[in-house]
Structures are given as structure tokens and as C-alpha cells.
A protein has these predicted regions:
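Acidic, proline/glycine-rich low-complexity IDRs
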Residues: 217-249, 280-282
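Amphipathic protein-protein interaction modules
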Residues: 167-226
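Long, intrinsically disordered low-complexity tandem-repeat segments
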Residues: 247-278
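Helix-boundary capping/turn motifs
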Residues: 8-9
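Short alpha-helix boundary/capping elements
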Residues: 40, 44, 198-201, 213, ...
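The feature captures two recurrent sequence modes
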Residues: 2-5, 15-22, 31-163
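Contiguous mid-protein beta-loop-alpha structural module that forms a pocket-lining wall or clamp
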Residues: 28
Length: 282
């Protein structure tokens, strides 16, 4: 949500804790974890309306709880994020070269599919993100420069791609999370999604999402998984995301940021047309 992004950008401890107070965050651990990482990166920011030490103690406690939740879930990208949060608590610099990249834009662009090319180009010098398909349209090579896009030569770029099979895995995990949920509605929805994935008839996965009012929940679930895969891809390159840079990826919506306040199974946030944007947890 917008308030979470605002707290992240400001590095405001009090605002971050207020946004998350009483909210179930198990479905958005990557996105909430990134907000915490950026607050720590900013030196723990201004604490308003309460004693600073009290707020810092709240931050430390919440950071430890979040690191534990990430370690328990153990999905793609959860281990490096948990380790980063622990390093902050211990007063150490986290592992990885910091790169000012917008992790949400990178995750979404990595998942983009186009006849001209799949995935994202990432500038290892600036953190800028561009869809491979956009570069392909100009027939250029970003390392040689693409004048029409304002890309100067001499930077090092790599291609990062979210595996096509990841979507099927996300669907199965989403259905499983609902089936293991705490209510009969969760269980019923999970079983309906499992049947839809196995059936060859007209009623498919997205029909069930729409009928059950779970489209936003699915977006959030899949989005958080994509953030994790993007973080893991960066960690494999020895990189650590620390904030946003100029990016030319797919335009982000309010929902692509994920929604800390909108869900886990039972409430949990992709559209039926596109496989994603920004999820319940494991």
C-alpha cells in the first residue's frame, strides 16, 4: 500500500510500525522485509510522537520476528533477506554489494513475456531496469548504448528472467496455502483451485479466483514470490537491493507493490489477463 511505500522512502520507523500494527504479514514477508531493510539502511530514520529509544526497541523486536518468519518460510530469497535483517540487528554490514534497484519493478519485469524477448536487463552500475523486449525493439545492446532510450555505453548489464514454470509452482502453492487455511472458506477455495488446475474444462484457475473474490489475494501472493526470486537472483550475483533507481519496467500499480493490509488466506493480492504483479504465505 501507499503508506508502506511512504514509510520506506522516508526511513520513518514510527510510520512503518504504525502501518503494520495488527496486520497479518505472512503473505508479504519479502515486501515488508524490504521496507525494514530500507529503514535500517537509512539509519533508522526519524521517530515521531514517541520516545526514540522506545520506537527503536519496537523496530528491533519486529525485525527479529520478521527474520524468524522468513527463516521458517524458507522460500526463494527468504534466506538472504533474513540474514540481512540479522546483520542489521547485530550492527554489521549485510553481505552483498548494495545496488539501488527497485525490487518490485525488477521482479515484475523479470516475469514479463514477449515475442521479442523475456525478462529484464539490469544495469549493474546504476540499478536501472529495462524489459528485454524493449531493447530488442531497437535492435540494440545496452552495453553499447541505445541512444533512443538514453542509455549510455560503457555500463555492465545482465539479463534476469523469472522461469516460466514458476507460475505453475506459484499456483500450486497458493492452492495449498488456502487448503491449509484456518477457515472452511479457505479450504473450499483451495480445493476448487486444485480441481481447476487438474480439469480440462472451461472453468480454469482464474475463473475460480474471480468467483471466490481472490484475484487481489493471488496478486499479492504471487507478487511476494516474485520479489523473493528477484532477490535470490541478485544474491547469486553478489548484489543486495537497497532502494530504487530509474527503471523502465512495466508501470507499477498500487497492487503490484503488494498489500500488507489486504490478506493471507482468508482475506489475502494477478489479474486473469496477466500472470502477475504482486501474496498468502507458505
Amino acid at each position: 500500500p501507499k503508506d508502506l511505500r511512504t514509510a520506506r522512502a522516508a526511513g520513518d520507523i514510527g510510520a512503518l510500525l504504525a502501518v503494520l500494527a495488527g496486520v497479518e504479514t505472512g503473505h508479504v514477508l519479502q515486501q515488508v522485509g524490504q521496507a525494514f531493510a530500507e529503514v535500517w539502511e537509512h539509519g533508522a530514520g526519524p521517530a515521531k510522537r514517541r520516545g526514540r529509544r522506545s520506537v527503536e526497541q519496537e523496530l528491533e523486536s519486529a525485525t527479529m520476528n520478521l527474520s524468524n518468519a522468513l527463516s521458517w518460510r524458507d522460500g526463494a530469497g527468504d534466506a538472504p533477506l533474513a540474514a540481512e535483517l540479522i546483520a542489521r540487528l547485530q550492527g554489521r554490514e549485510p553481505e552483498g554489494r548494495p545496488l539501488p534497484v527497485d525490487l518490485g519493478v525488477l521482479a515484475e519485469t523479470m516475469a514479463s513475456r514477449d515475442d521479442a524477448g523475456n525478462g529484464a536487463y539490469l544495469d549493474l552500475d546504476t540499478g536501472a531496469v529495462l524489459p528485454v523486449a524493449v531493447i530488442a525493439e531497437y535492435g540494440g545492446d545496452p552495453e553499447s548504448g541505445v541512444e533512443e532510450l538514453g542509455i549510455e555505453p560503457g555500463h555492465e548489464w545482465i539479463v534476469l528472467d523469472d522461469p516460466a514454470e514458476a507460475t505453475d509452482a506459484d499456483r500450486r502453492d497458493f492452492a495449498r496455502a488456502l487448503s491449509n487455511g484456518s477457515t472452511l472458506d479457505d479450504f473450499s477455495a483451495g480445493e476448487a483451485l486444485n480441481r481447476a488446475m487438474k480439469a480440462r474444462g472451461a472453468k480454469n484457475f482464474h475463473d475460480v479466483l474471480d468467483e471466490r473474490g481472490l484475484v487481489a489475494v493471488w496478486r499479492t501472493f504471487q507478487g511476494d514470490r516474485r520479489w523473493g526470486r528477484a532477490r535470490e537472483a541478485l544474491a547469486a550475483q553478489g548484489l543486495r537491493p537497497v532502494g530504487s533507481a530509474r527503471s523502465e519496467g512495466p508501470e507499477k500499480s498500487e497492487e503490484s507493490e503488494g498489500s500488507a493490509g489486504s490478506a493471507g488466506p482468508g482475506e489475502p493480492g494477478e489479474s486473469a489477463e496477466s500472470e502477475g504483479s504482486a501474496g498468502p504465505s507458505h
